[in-house]
């Protein structure tokens, strides 16, 4: 939106901007913010903050950190009462001035620089498709003597027998793709989200109800370069959640909020370009893929068990990655085939449209780290000419047992992928994009803050199974 500090100053004055919202991303992937009066904001100055209070950052004895604005990300916040300009910032060490190695946006910036340094390509495009659910209410608690969650939605299949205000037209389990209103209760809400996305600079391509009951949705927008695509995804999630909130609803990108129905994934489309020319197309190759694209796929599939520590980084992620709910649990590639973890979309003979789609990820993690890790895995495949296993152009869910035994599967838990990341991360260290410190911090944080707390607590379903032993 802006190219320099003078542009920002002029906009603030001309548009009577009242506040500037300073935004940055914590290590797990949630945007943080504090707000300055616009009169106190100097786009040439750094902002200080306490890094020890941010998840995954600094210890208390070295807590001071500084923020530098990325003025290209400035957007007017559509939800604040007083006119507010949101700006994403990079994090730096206040003493050395160096980029902070645990700043997710700095990781993405380094990934783009490393790509250019390889000579393989100069641009990587990423197009995430993040699914989400919209509920009317959610209640949950975990205490010493109880643990529960309760979701409700006027469109939920479980409400067909509800007594109050029941006019039918509930979405059946796995029945949400693509019925028209009134079965689709959320067409207007998605339209409102889409218009807000457009006003914020994202180019919406389509929106629809997804397969799941209770308002599962997908809104697709145009791809972007790596760092910008991660920024776009954070903006997308912010707008989805706030439009839902404004309408008395609540939106979640949790991978598996509902037992017995489809989870919410985030298919990630990717392509490499050099000098304005696409590198993934060859009309003679399988599915129109070039050797470069095939090796890129080989790298991602080889490293997928460790990659999932960034692309599917929550305990809940692995409730989605199970057979039977259209989740891509098979680590193979194929054209058109949605049962494969890596799909080659049919794009005709247009070289510029050729891309690969990694279908395993979800939106519960940090997009800056996830996209950077995917790029580095793909580049490792290109540099080392890693051949993927032969493509499988049949329904992988219906393979005979002897065939299925030869198909690699995604790991089944967060603990398993963290173990794999611990053993397989050399490809992430190339170009100093990820550092050993970041990887160690990520693994330790996930084990201590997500795996260990669940190991300490009995699950409610255990009472169904074991109370009367």
Curated annotation (Swiss-Prot):
<dbReference type="GO" id="GO:0019740">
    <property type="term" value="P:nitrogen utilization"/>
</dbReference>
<dbReference type="GO" id="GO:0006542">
    <property type="term" value="P:glutamine biosynthetic process"/>
</dbReference>
<feature type="binding site">
    <location>
        <position position="267"/>
    </location>
    <ligand>
        <name>Mg(2+) 1</name>
    </ligand>
</feature>
<keyword id="KW-0067">ATP-binding</keyword>
<feature type="binding site">
    <location>
        <position position="263"/>
    </location>
    <ligand>
        <name>L-glutamate</name>
    </ligand>
</feature>
<keyword id="KW-0963">Cytoplasm</keyword>
<comment type="subunit">
    <text>Oligomer of 12 subunits arranged in the form of two hexagons.</text>
</comment>
<dbReference type="GO" id="GO:0005524">
    <property type="term" value="F:ATP binding"/>
</dbReference>
<feature type="binding site">
    <location>
        <position position="271"/>
    </location>
    <ligand>
        <name>ATP</name>
    </ligand>
</feature>
<dbReference type="GO" id="GO:0005737">
    <property type="term" value="C:cytoplasm"/>
</dbReference>
<dbReference type="InterPro" id="IPR027303">
    <property type="entry name" value="Gln_synth_gly_rich_site"/>
</dbReference>
<feature type="binding site">
    <location>
        <position position="320"/>
    </location>
    <ligand>
        <name>L-glutamate</name>
    </ligand>
</feature>
<keyword id="KW-0547">Nucleotide-binding</keyword>
<dbReference type="InterPro" id="IPR008147">
    <property type="entry name" value="Gln_synt_N"/>
</dbReference>
<dbReference type="InterPro" id="IPR008146">
    <property type="entry name" value="Gln_synth_cat_dom"/>
</dbReference>
<dbReference type="GO" id="GO:0046872">
    <property type="term" value="F:metal ion binding"/>
</dbReference>
<keyword id="KW-0436">Ligase</keyword>
<feature type="binding site">
    <location>
        <position position="129"/>
    </location>
    <ligand>
        <name>Mg(2+) 1</name>
    </ligand>
</feature>
<comment type="similarity">
    <text>Belongs to the glutamine synthetase family.</text>
</comment>
<keyword id="KW-0460">Magnesium</keyword>
<feature type="binding site">
    <location>
        <position position="357"/>
    </location>
    <ligand>
        <name>Mg(2+) 1</name>
    </ligand>
</feature>
<comment type="function">
    <text>Catalyzes the ATP-dependent biosynthesis of glutamine from glutamate and ammonia. Complements L-glutamine auxotrophy of an E.coli glnA mutant.</text>
</comment>
<feature type="binding site">
    <location>
        <position position="338"/>
    </location>
    <ligand>
        <name>L-glutamate</name>
    </ligand>
</feature>
<feature type="modified residue" description="O-AMP-tyrosine">
    <location>
        <position position="397"/>
    </location>
</feature>
<keyword id="KW-0597">Phosphoprotein</keyword>
<feature type="domain" description="GS beta-grasp">
    <location>
        <begin position="15"/>
        <end position="96"/>
    </location>
</feature>
<feature type="binding site">
    <location>
        <position position="218"/>
    </location>
    <ligand>
        <name>Mg(2+) 2</name>
    </ligand>
</feature>
<feature type="binding site">
    <location>
        <begin position="269"/>
        <end position="271"/>
    </location>
    <ligand>
        <name>ATP</name>
    </ligand>
</feature>
<feature type="binding site">
    <location>
        <position position="205"/>
    </location>
    <ligand>
        <name>ATP</name>
    </ligand>
</feature>
<dbReference type="InterPro" id="IPR036651">
    <property type="entry name" value="Gln_synt_N_sf"/>
</dbReference>
<protein>
    <recommendedName>
        <fullName>Glutamine synthetase</fullName>
        <ecNumber>6.3.1.2</ecNumber>
    </recommendedName>
</protein>
<dbReference type="Pfam" id="PF00120">
    <property type="entry name" value="Gln-synt_C"/>
</dbReference>
<dbReference type="InterPro" id="IPR001637">
    <property type="entry name" value="Gln_synth_I_adenylation_site"/>
</dbReference>
<dbReference type="InterPro" id="IPR014746">
    <property type="entry name" value="Gln_synth/guanido_kin_cat_dom"/>
</dbReference>
<feature type="binding site">
    <location>
        <position position="131"/>
    </location>
    <ligand>
        <name>Mg(2+) 2</name>
    </ligand>
</feature>
<feature type="binding site">
    <location>
        <position position="343"/>
    </location>
    <ligand>
        <name>ATP</name>
    </ligand>
</feature>
<dbReference type="Pfam" id="PF03951">
    <property type="entry name" value="Gln-synt_N"/>
</dbReference>
<feature type="binding site">
    <location>
        <begin position="262"/>
        <end position="263"/>
    </location>
    <ligand>
        <name>L-glutamate</name>
    </ligand>
</feature>
<dbReference type="GO" id="GO:0016020">
    <property type="term" value="C:membrane"/>
</dbReference>
<dbReference type="InterPro" id="IPR004809">
    <property type="entry name" value="Gln_synth_I"/>
</dbReference>
<dbReference type="GO" id="GO:0004356">
    <property type="term" value="F:glutamine synthetase activity"/>
</dbReference>
<feature type="binding site">
    <location>
        <position position="352"/>
    </location>
    <ligand>
        <name>ATP</name>
    </ligand>
</feature>
């Amino acid at each position: 939106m802006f190219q320099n500090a003078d542009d920002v100053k002029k906009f603030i004055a001309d548009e009577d901007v009242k506040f500037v919202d300073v935004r940055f991303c914590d290590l797990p992937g949630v945007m943080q913010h504090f707000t300055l009066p616009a009169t106190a904001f100097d786009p040439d100055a750094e902002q200080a903050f306490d890094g020890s209070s941010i998840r995954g950052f600094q210890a208390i004895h070295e807590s001071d950190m500084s923020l530098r604005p990325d003025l290209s990300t400035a957007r007017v916040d559509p939800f604040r009462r007083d006119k507010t300009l949101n700006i994403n910032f990079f994090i730096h060490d206040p003493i050395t001035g160096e980029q902070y190695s645990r700043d997710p946006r700095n990781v993405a910036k380094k990934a783009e620089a490393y790509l250019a340094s390889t000579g393989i390509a100069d641009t990587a495009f990423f197009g995430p498709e993040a699914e989400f659910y919209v509920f009317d209410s959610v209640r949950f608690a975990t205490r010493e003597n109880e643990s529960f969650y309760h979701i409700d939605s006027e469109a939920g299949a479980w409400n067909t027998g509800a007594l109050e205000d029941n006019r039918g037209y509930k979405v059946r389990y796995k029945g949400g793709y693509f019925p028209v209103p009134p079965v689709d209760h959320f067409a207007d809400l998605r339209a409102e989200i889409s218009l807000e996305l457009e006003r914020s600079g994202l180019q919406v391509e389509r929106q629809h109800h997804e397969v799941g009951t209770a308002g599962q949705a997908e809104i697709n927008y145009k791809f972007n370069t790596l760092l910008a695509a991660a920024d776009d995804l954070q903006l997308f999630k912010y707008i989805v959640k706030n439009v839902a909130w404004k309408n008395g609803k609540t939106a979640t990108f949790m991978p598996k909020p509902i037992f017995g129905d489809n989870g919410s994934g985030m298919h990630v489309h990717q392509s490499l370009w050099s000098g304005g020319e696409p590198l993934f197309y060859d009309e003679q190759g399988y599915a129109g893929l070039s050797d470069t694209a095939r090796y890129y796929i080989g790298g991602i599939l080889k490293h997928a068990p460790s990659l999932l520590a960034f692309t599917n980084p929550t305990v809940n992620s692995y409730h989605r990655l199970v057979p039977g709910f259209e989740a891509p649990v098979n680590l193979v590639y194929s054209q058109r085939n949605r049962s494969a973890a890596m799909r080659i979309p049919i794009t005709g003979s247009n070289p510029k449209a050729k891309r690969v789609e990694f279908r395993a990820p979800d939106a519960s993690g940090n997009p800056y780290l996830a996209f950077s890790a995917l790029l580095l895995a793909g580049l490792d495949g290109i540099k080392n000419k890693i051949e993927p296993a032969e493509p499988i152009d049949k329904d992988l869910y219906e393979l005979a047992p002897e065939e299925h035994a030869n198909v690699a599967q995604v790991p089944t838990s967060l603990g398993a992928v963290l173990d794999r990341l611990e053993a397989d991360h050399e490809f992430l260290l190339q170009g100093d994009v990820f550092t050993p410190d970041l990887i160690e911090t990520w693994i330790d944080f996930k084990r201590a803050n997500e795996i260990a707390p669940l190991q300490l607590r009995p699950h409610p379903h255990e009472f169904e199974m074991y109370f009367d032993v």
